[in-house]
From Swiss-Prot:
The lineage of its organism: Eukaryota, Metazoa, Ecdysozoa, Arthropoda, Hexapoda. The gene is mib1. ANK repeats lie at residues 567-596, 600-629, 633-662, 666-695, 699-731, 735-765, 769-798, 802-833. It comes from Drosophila melanogaster (Fruit fly). CDD domains: RING-HC_MIB1_rpt1, RING-HC_MIB1_rpt2, RING-HC_MIB1_rpt3, ZZ_Mind_bomb. This is E3 ubiquitin-protein ligase mind-bomb. It comes from the Eukaryota.
Amino acid sequence: MSCAATLSSAKDSTNANASGGGGGGGGGGAPTNSNTNTNTNTQSTAVGVVVSSAAGTGVGVGGGGGGGGSLPGGTTSSSSASAAGGVAAGGGGNSAAALVRRFSMEGVGARVIRGPDWKWNKQDGGEGHVGTVRNFESAEEVVVVWDNGTAANYRCAGAYDLRILDSAPTGVKHEGTMCDTCRQQPIFGIRWKCAECINYDLCSICYHGDKHHLRHRFYRITTPGGERTMLEPRRKSKKVLARGIFPGARVVRGVDWQWEDQDGGVGRRGKVNEIQDWSSASPRSAAYVIWDNGSKNLYRVGFEGMADLKVVNDAKGSNVYRDHLPLLGENGPGKGPHGFQIGDKVTVDLDLEIVQSLQHGHGGWTDGMFECLSNAGMVVGIDEDHDIVVAYNSGNRWTFNPAVLTKVSSPTTAPPEFQVGDIVKICSDVESIKILQRGHGEWADAMQLTLGKIGRVQQVYHDNDLKVEVGNTSWTYNPLAVCKVASSTASDGSCAPVIPSSERLSAILKKLFEPNVSGDATEEFVKAAANGFAARCEEYLAGAAQPSTSSASPSSGPDVNVNGVFAGHTALQAASQNGHIEVIQVLLRHAVDVEIEDKDGDRAVHHAAFGDEAAVIEILAKAGADLNARNKRRQTSLHIAVNKGHLNVVKTLLTLGCHPSLQDSEGDTPLHDAISKEHDEMLSLLLDFGADITLNNNNGFNALHHAALKGNPSAMKILLTKTNRPWIVEEKKDDGYTALHLAALNNHVEIAELLVHMGKANMDRQNVNLQTALHLAVERQHVQIVKLLVQDGADLNIPDKDGDTPLHEALRHHTLSQLKQLQDVEGFGKLLMGLRNANNKKASASIACFLAANGADLTLKNRKQQTPLDLCPDPNLCKTLVKCYNERKTDDSELPGNVAGTSSSARARAASGSLNQSSSVNMPLSSLAASSTFPAASSSSIFALNGIANEMSQSLHEDPPKSSASLDECLVCSDAKRDTVFKPCGHVSCCETCAPRVKKCLICRETVSSREKIDECLVCSDRRAAVFFRPCGHMVACEHCSALMKKCVLCRTQIDEILSFSLCCGGSGRPEKVSVAAGAMATVGLPLPDDRFMEAAAAAACANASGHSVAMNNTVVTPVAGSSNQLNSQNNLLAAAAASSNVSNLSAAGNAMVAPSNVNNFQMDDVQKLKQQLQDIKEQTMCPVCFDRIKNMVFLCGHGTCQMCGDQIEGCPICRKTVEKRILLF
C-alpha cells in the first residue's frame, strides 16, 4: 500500500467515531524547560468570586502551580494550571471542538516584522525588529509581543500592520516536501517553490540566504495546500536586516517567564547562544541562553505564542526579502482557502453517489450521515487538511470534503444590522453559542444564565459585535448569536421572524427593565453580600423592609435562606473572600452555616484564605469553623494561603492551631508548596510551628527532596538549619535517591554544596541501581558537581549494578564522532574549555581525564569484564589517561611514607613539604611554594602550586585579587579603568577612550605600534582577560585559565613568559616563566588538584614497594598481585610537586592497613544521626505525660497518651481541650 493510500485509510475512519459528541480533554503539554530543569508537580486551588452589577456575576475556581522537572529514571513531570479569580472560562467540547481550538491557534507563535500599513512609530523597535504573535483577539485584530518587551494589538484585516517572517514556530509543515539545498524534510513554515525549475523547493532560511538562482521567480506557499503567490525575482528585491532575539543578543526574563530564578533573579542578564527547536513539531521556537550566573537553559521564543525572554541589546539576524513575506491575516484565522469559515450555515446538495465518491479520503461515509442530505448544519471546525467539520441539530458532527458543501443563503449567514437600543433575544442553544462566541468576546459559564433571555443593545463595535445588557449584566455577543425581538421563539429555540403586536412589545420592555428580572431573591442576596451591603443583607434576612434597588419586596415572597446558593456559592463565601466583616457578622447573627461547601468543596475559610483576609479567618474560627477542612483536592486553607503568598493569613492560621502538615490529593504539604513558590519566610514559619519535614508526596519526595529537585538553595539552607532531624539528609526515596542524588541529577551545585558541607551528606550512598551521586553527575556531564564531589572525597571507584564506575560512565558517553575531534591532545585550550562547559562535546572526555588524575582506577572491570580503557576506542585519549595514571604513580613514590595514618591536616602538611616545621604550613600555597623552605624546588613545583591555588579559588567561587585603585585607574583621565593593552611592550595604562591619543607608552616610554581592548577570557568567558603572553603579545585569558597553558589559545604560539595584570599596569614583580611540568599538564588539559587531593596522595604513600593495600577516598584499594608494572596508583597527579628530589623518605608504615580519618568521621556522623533518629521516634511514640510508656490511647482532638495517664486526666496535655472520648489503640 502506498503512503498516500495509508493516510487516506486512516482519514476515512474519522466519521466512524465522530457521531454523538463527547467530552473533550486538555491539550498536550509543552516540553519541560530543558532536560535538567527542576520544576515538579505542584497543584493548588485558587478560589475567585467576582460579583458586580455592572460586569455580571461569576465565581471561578482554578488551580495554580507547576512546571516540569527531571526526575530519576529519565522521566519528566509537568503540569500547568492557572489561578482563576473572577469568571472562569467554560470548557467542554469534543474532538471537533479540539480541531476548532487547534485551527483558531493557527498563526499563534509566528515571528513577524512590521508590514506595509504600519503607523505605530517605533513600538517594535524599528524596521526589521522581530516580534511574536501571541493571540488573535478577533479576525481583524492580533496581539504581538515584540522582542523588546512591548505588547500591543495590531490590524490583520483590511489594513495589514504585520508581515510573517517565519511561521515555523507555529508548527506549519508541508508534508512530502524537502528543501533542495539544506535537505530539510519536511519544510516547516513558508514553502518557496521555483516557478522555472521542475520540483525545486526552498525553505525560508535558504530562500532568504540567496540559495538557487536569484533571477528565477518563485511561488510562495504559506500553508499546506494553500494558494500559490507568484513573486518577482530576488535579484532586484529589497532586503532588510532582521534584529531581535538572535545569537549574541543580551536578554532578561520576559512576560511569560515561569522558570523561577534560573536567570539569577529579576533583571539579571544572559546571552543568547543559539536559536533551537522547543519541540520537533515547532522548529526555531526557542533560544538557548547562558546567564551571567553560569546557568544555561532553553527558553520559549514563539512556541505557542510564549515569550520567556525580552531583549536588552538586540543582535543581528539574517537579511530577508521584506516585500516577499506574506501579510499576517491575508488568509485570516478561522478561514480556509475554500472560502468556508466557522459559523457558516451549509448543506449538501449533490447526489448520494457523488457525495460518497468525494468523501473518500476526507472522512469517509457512514449510514448515519443521511441526515446531512436534508438538513442544514453549521461549520464548527476546519482541520489541518482543510476538511470541514459540520454540526447538526441531532448533536452529530461530520467531516466533509469542502467540494460537497454549499453555503446556505439565509439571514443568519450575515449578521443583521443592529442599532443601540434594539431589543434582542439571546440564542438558547448552549453548544451553538459557544462556537459562535469564539473570537467574539469568547464564552464564560456565567453567560449561561442569559440564554434565551431578552436584552437591549448598549453598543455596536466596529466589527459588528454587540454589547448587550441582560438584566443587571452586560456581555459581548456575536451578532449571529442574537436576534431582534421582532420575532417569536421557534420550538427548537431558534429565532423565527414574526412581527409582534404593540402590546407584546410593551410587555417585553416592562419585563426587561425590571431590576429583578429573574425574580430570584437569593441571587440578589448573594450579590449584596459580595458587594459588602450589610444593611441590605439584614433587610433580606429580616424580610421586613424593601431593598432600595428592587421594586419587589423580600417579604412578598418566601424569606431568603441565609445559606442560599447562587452560581455555586453562598453569601458567606462571597463575603469572606472580599473581606466584608460587617456582612459576615450579620450572617453569623442569623445562624449561617460556616461549613457549607461550594462545588469544589471550598468552604468560607478557603475563600477567606484566597482573598488574603486574615481578620475574616479569626472571626470564622471563633464561630467554630474547621480550619483544617479540606476541599475536593484535599487542600486546607493553609495550602491556599501558602500558594497565594499571603503571609498574614499563614501566620493567623498557624497561630489559631491549623495543622501545618496535612497533605492534599497530590500528597503535598504546605511545606512542599512553600518550597515550590519560593516563599522562604513562610517556610521558616511552618517549621517553627512544627511542620513535618519527613512526609512524602505522591511522587515520593519529602520536603528536602523537593527543595533539591526544585533547585531552591535558600529553602535548602532553611531546612538544614531549622530541622531537628539531621538524619533526614540521608533519607532515600523508593528508588533509592537521596537529596544529593537529585541535586547531582539536576546540576544544582549550590544545593549539593549545602548538603555536603552543611548537611554532612554521605556522598557514597547508592540508589536502587547502586549509583552514587557521582555516577549521576558524570552521566549527565555536570562538571561542577563532579568537581565538588571529587574534591570533597567521594569514592571514585564504587561500581553500580552493572559493575560500572563513574569512569566507565564518562567514557561510554564519549562517542566515536566526538573522539575524532580530540586527535590533537596537545590542544590544551580546547580541552580545558571542554571541562569548563558541560555542553561541549568534549565534556565527557575531560571528565574522564579529571577522574583518572584524581584516583579513578583504570583496571576495574564491570560485569561484562570491561575496563574503562576497553570502552575508549580513541588511542590518543587512552594514552592521556594512562599518562595521568602513571605520573600519579610516579609522584606518589616521592611522598613521605609515614603520613598515611595521621590526621587530615598532618597529611596535608606532609604533602606540602613535611620538612618545614614552621608556621608557613598555614600560608597560602602560592606563598608556600615561593618560600625559602624549598631550596631545591624547581620552577615547575612552584608553578604547579600556583595552579592549585587558582583551582581552589575557582572552586570556592572567588575572583582573583584585584589591583589597587592606583594601578586600576586610567593614567590620562583618572575616571575610567584601564582596559587597553599597548603592543609590543604589553603595558596597560589607559582606558579605551584615551588610548588613541597616546603615542608612547606612559610606563616604559616605548613607541606604541598597536592597541588592543581587553575583552573577556576566551576560555571561561566569566572573567576579564588579565594575563599577557610573550612572545605572541596576546592578552586573551584570565589568571585562572592561564595557569596551565603552554600555548596561546588564540594563535597557538608557544608561551615563554606570562605577565600578570598588575605587572602590565606597572606594578612590582617579575614575569613568570612557563615550566616544563606545567606544559606537560597542559597537554593533558586538566585543572590542577588542590590540597584535598594532596591529602589522599600522602595517605597512599604509606604502602611499601611490595604493593600493600592502601585506604583512600573512603575505599580500600588493593593492587593486582604480581603486576608491578600495572597501573595500580590512584593518587593525585601532582601531589608530590612541592617535595624536592632531595627530601629524605620517612619510614614506611609497614604492612598495616590504615584507614583515613574521614572514614572514622563518617562513622561517627552516622552513629550520631542514628541516635537522633531513635530519639525522634521515641518522642513520637512515648506518652507525653509520664515519658515511660508507649502511647496507646488517643482523644478526639488527635493527641494521645498511655492508658494509665489518659484515665486520670480531664484535659488534653497538648492542646488543653476537654477530653470527650478516649479511644484505645491495639
